[in-house]
Amino acid sequence: MTTYAQDSKLRLKTKIGADGRCVIEDNFFTPPFKLMAPFYPKDDLAEIMLLAVSPGLMKGDAQDMQLNIGQNCKLRITSQSFEKIHNTEDGFAGRDMHIVVGENAFLDFAPFPLIPFENAHFKGNTTISLHSSSQLLYSEIIVAGRVARNELFQFNRLHTKISILQDNKPIYYDNTILDPKTTDMTNMCMFDGYTHYLNLVLINCPLELFGARELIEEAEVDGAVSEIASSHLCLKALAKGSEPLLALREKIARLVTQKIQKD
């Protein structure tokens, strides 16, 4: 099988425009990346959709993403569709992402789920730098595979790392390793019969621990939430489809953004 590995770059820098809303100050991207112009669904909250004109990640693909959210910006970044990791044969596909959230800025990073196909190998590394006044809502959703085809946990390996620093001090680190060759993904300590996994982190967001627990109990998911450093929250949930997890995440995001815009 012939593959054409691609190194892709994305740069995005935002600032507050003349009308007091978040705008793009500078951007640069190489194929398959594209950025839609920001739109404003709610007052001063900007939304930018990240596009990837591609069927998915292949063997040798390497993505380099750098996002710089300017001071006082309120921004939600979404993706175009579910992200597919194809058969990477004897190699892997990777992504390095560096995010900086400025003073008094808010970022809601809300990509669609990641689907590793049979024999897919993916490595993801995300580093997020915050100020003490920055607010962050960051998530990833991982799927067991092409569930509709009953292709469950047939990928090779999936390894994602998330590191969050506040004023240059580490406050959160997540190291997710899913390796079906060495671990039974269906046991009760892993997916336990579920097929979709949500990992959500809230930093300086106006949502309390008990409020988050109530939202989990109301949703059609199996999940829990914990306090991490300085009363920030980490929420993890499992479901048998993407819809319940996306609905829970959207409900949390809606509550958080409503409170932020009132402040």
From Swiss-Prot:
MF terms (GO), sorted A to Z: nickel cation binding
Keywords assigned by UniProt, alphabetized: Chaperone, Cytoplasm, Nickel insertion
A cellular component term, taken from the record's GO annotations: cytoplasm
Pfam families from the UniProt entry: UreD
Main localization, broad class: cytoplasm
Compartment(s): Cytoplasm
Recorded superkingdom: Bacteria
UniProt cross-references to InterPro entries, sorted A to Z: UreD (IPR002669)
Reported function: Required for maturation of urease via the functional incorporation of the urease nickel metallocenter.
Subunit structure: UreH, UreF and UreG form a complex that acts as a GTP-hydrolysis-dependent molecular chaperone, activating the urease apoprotein by helping to assemble the nickel containing metallocenter of UreC. The UreE protein probably delivers the nickel.
Family stated for the protein in its record: Belongs to the UreD family.
This protein's name: Urease accessory protein UreH
Species for this entry: Helicobacter acinonychis (strain Sheeba)
